[in-house]
Amino acid sequence: MAQNVEQQVAQLQQLQQQLSSIVAQKQQLELQLREIERALKELDEIEEDTKVYKTVGGLLIEADRDEVKEELEDRKETLELRVKTLEKQEKRLQQQIENLQKRLQKALQQAEGGGGAGAA
């Protein structure tokens, strides 16, 4: 019984680490999404003949405004899909963690109850 509980505790810790990693990844992607949304807003607000630059490697190069906007919209769409995927993984892991916590709690209660009944 104790070995099974130890395995479940180890599994719980592993799931919690995975959840933490997914949450961190999701936060990074959401930050990138906000930056892209700000850039798209700025592109919408500037005059069409305003010079636009984009970063390529360590350089800033002049680029076509519409082309930059299209690239940003594509990137935004990709990031939104990745965030949705991570959200699904996050929910699935949260459910697994919750189920495992319930099983662990039940196993510990049975262990305590079994020990008390044997002593009586």
Curated annotation (Swiss-Prot):
Q: Which InterPro entries match?
A: PFD_beta-like, PfdB, Prefoldin
Sorted keywords for this record are:
Chaperone, Cytoplasm
| One of the GO BP terms on file | chaperone-mediated protein complex assembly
Location in the cell: Cytoplasm
Q: How does it assemble?
A: Heterohexamer of two alpha and four beta subunits.
Q: What does the similarity note say? A: Belongs to the prefoldin subunit beta family.
Name-wise, this protein is Prefoldin subunit beta
- What is the organism of origin for this protein? Methanopyrus kandleri (strain AV19 / DSM 6324 / JCM 9639 / NBRC 100938)
Q: Which gene encodes it?
A: pfdB
